[in-house]
Amino acid sequence: VRRKDGDAKVTGEAKYIDDLAFPNMIYGATVRSTIPHGRIRARHLTLTPDFIVADHRDIPGPNYVALIDPDQPCLAVDQVRHVAEPILLVGHADKHALIGLESRVSMEYDALPPNYDATASDVCFKKISIDKGDIDRGLADADIIVESEYRTGHQEQLYIETNGVIAVPGDGEMTVYGSLQCPYYVHKALVVLLNLPADRV
């Protein structure tokens, strides 16, 4: 099966996110947590009025990333749970105006005890049991039963560019262009966050 995007990628004709441009673009940056765990006490912004700032209250739909469980906010509300957790979105018509943003936007926290041991966390791991057929009977009839614990390293893909998206709003709809491995995950999350029907995203 020939990949639809194969020729464009191997010949260098494929467009990167930074190659795309639309009228009246606003460039965005994310203000992220600098501590692993804490309550947000205050935010300090020294930005001119031509900047746009959005927080969790500006999300039209429920504030969570729709993946498996609705347990991860898109933008932190009053507490951060890991370094680099998104808190604010900042936009400007000039992408160069976003450089050095960390010197003009800062968060004040009440630090809480972090957890550096993933195996001691009650939120990092999930046990999902897939049972098919009569398990007890199968075990009783088995000649050999192998029980063990396996650990594997973290796997990540090799992207041809850093992740990025461009969202183009329309009349009650949103079109998103992105460097995405799994666009259906992004689609599912955006439908919830934007509070739009699935066929409008």
Where are these regions (language model features)?
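Structural alpha/beta core scaffold segments of enzyme domains
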Residues: 1-200
